[in-house]
Amino acid sequence: MGLSDKINSKSDEAVGAAKEKIGGLTDDSDLKSAGADQKASGKVAQKVEDVKDKANDLKHNVQAAADKLKG
């Protein structure tokens, strides 16, 4: 996951949480709903990127182990 992807997903999560809170305080159900959606989207994007990072780490570990066995 690139740094910009991490920043964007965290930003979506934070902005969404703020919108959700403001929508709740102002009784603006559309803003609250949009905020909840944006926050959830940011969380999902973060989890997807975390899985990609772990898969990439696993790939490197398997490759290192295979290289060690060849050696």
From Swiss-Prot:
Q: Where is this region: Disordered?
A: 20-46
The cross-references to Gene3D superfamilies, in alphabetical order and at most eight, read: YjbJ (1.10.1470.10)
Quote the InterPro entries the UniProt record gives. CsbD, YjbJ_sf
| Name of the protein this chain belongs to | UPF0337 protein PPA1427
Q: Into which family does the record put it?
A: Belongs to the UPF0337 (CsbD) family.
The record's Pfam families line, in alphabetical order, gives: CsbD
